[in-house]
C-alpha cells in the first residue's frame, strides 16, 4: 500500500481496551497525516499476555473502532495464545502503510516495529494526539478496580476529579 497509489495510508496500533478519548484524539491527528487510516487492533491473545486479562472482547473493540469518524479500516492481529512476538510487524509487512503512528509514551527506542518499517519504507511518527498521553486504558481500569482511588497519572487527585467530566 505504498504512496505510488493515489492515497497516503497511515496505520496506528494498540489494544484499545477500553477505548478512550486519548485514542480518539490520536486517530484524529493520525488521519491528518494521510488519506486513509488503518487501525491495527491487538487481539485478545495479545491482551491476555500483556495485561493478564481482557476487559472488552476483541469483536466489541473492533466494532467500536469501526464506528469512529476517520477510521477507514480495522485489522485484527493474528497473535496466537501466549505470543512471544508482541509486535505488529506481520500486519505492517502485509499492509505496507506509508506512515506508522505511535502515541502516548512510545518513542524510537521502545517500539519493536522499527526494522520492519525501515524495510518497507514506512515513516514512523511519534507523540501523536492532543496534549500527549491524556488518558490510559490501564489507568481507567486500575481506577475502576480501586473504586476511583488516587489517579495513576501522578496528579495527586482522585481519578474522578482528574479525568471525569462530572467528577
Where are these regions (language model features)?
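Acidic/negatively charged segments and metal-coordination signatures
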Residues: 145-167
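Nucleotidyltransferase catalytic core that binds NTPs
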Residues: 1-147
Amino acid at each position: 500500500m505504498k504512496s505510488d497509489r493515489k492515497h497516503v495510508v497511515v496505520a496506528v496500533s494498540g489494544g484499545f481496551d477500553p477505548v478512550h478519548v486519548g485514542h480518539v484524539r490520536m486517530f484524529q491527528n493520525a488521519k491528518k497525516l494521510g488519506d486513509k487510516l488503518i487501525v491495527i487492533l491487538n487481539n485478545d491473545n495479545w491482551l491476555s499476555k500483556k495485561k493478564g486479562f481482557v476487559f472488552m472482547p476483541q469483536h466489541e473493540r473492533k466494532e467500536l473502532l469501526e464506528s469512529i469518524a476517520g477510521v477507514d479500516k480495522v485489522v485484527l492481529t493474528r497473535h496466537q495464545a501466549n505470543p512471544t512476538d508482541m509486535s505488529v510487524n506481520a500486519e505492517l509487512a502485509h499492509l505496507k502503510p506509508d506512515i506508522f503512528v505511535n502515541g502516548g509514551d512510545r518513542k524510537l527506542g521502545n517500539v519493536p516495529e522499527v526494522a520492519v518499517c525501515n524495510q518497507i519504507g514506512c515513516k514512523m511518527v511519534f507523540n501523536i494526539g492532543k496534549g500527549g498521553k491524556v488518558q490510559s486504558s490501564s489507568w481507567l481500569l486500575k481506577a475502576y478496580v480501586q473504586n476511583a482511588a488516587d489517579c495513576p497519572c501522578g496528579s495527586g487527585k482522585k481519578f474522578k476529579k482528574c479525568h471525569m467530566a462530572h467528577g
